[in-house]
Amino acid sequence: FKKSKVEVVAAVEDTPYSVPKDIITKKDINELKNLIKTIATEKNTQIFENGVKSITSKLLEYGIEKELSQLLGEGIDELDEVGKELLKKRIKAFLGAPQPLDSGKSKKVLFIGPTGVGKTTTVAKIASHLILNEGKKVMLVTADVFRIAAYEQIKSYGDILGVPVRVVSNVFEFHKLQPEFKNYDVVLIDTAGRSHKDEKRVNELKTFMKYAECDEIYLCLSATTRPQDLKEVIKKYDFAGNYKLIFTKLDETDNYSSILNAVYYSGQPISYFTNGQIVPDDLMLADSEIIFSSIVKGY
């Protein structure tokens, strides 16, 4: 793919524009991000692409990060049927195919995230899916010993699903459970929600993750998270390395810019969306169509 180009109003020479692309790669995003940062050092510099300022503005107003709005809107003159179809393809290509849990490869699966995102309920939904739809033997483990009634909550789910639930307060207790793990296809590990500003709790999680040696990690985030908070959370959980994103509470907002922005900030793939409290019904594979429909609603 050719490198995306932008026009600076104050520039002396005109810059040619690239042909609109159907597929956007992470390389394209990084190139555009670096280019815009270089050009936009002057406070009053205005940046826009040929014929797409209005479309880019719509994406910005929706809440999408500036550089990503610029890239998604490149070459789209208006949101007519052709423009909508191109935007839909770009959003789908940017997010990529959802990457759900592979129960055939992953044994120990860890779920992390801030407080209040509905992590425990999400774990229960995935456990239910594995049991009812894939016929897997599942064990639930909770490392949440901080929240009042945390164990009772996940234990109630375990009782309903007919699966064992174990509680651990540290990684040493977790390792003592290893002999039991061999009797199950998948072990889902719930952790305490941690504020990204609570250094002590975050460091405890780092230690647990280092020695737990889990096969997959999922970062649970709420679709209602404020933009600045989202950026800080993504940065704080950077230590997790390779992980997948789960977005919860889609039923509590009509704006899903946080999903696009989180993928943009982190470079990590999405897996699931949740849109309610019902176990197991309110769980779905991440779907770019939902985000696109929200953006173009009213056009």
Place the predicted regions along the sequence by residue:
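Non-catalytic terminal/linker segments enriched in charged/polar, low-complexity residues
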Residues: 1-99
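Switch II (G3) loop of P-loop NTPases
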Residues: 112-115, 134, 138-149, 158-204
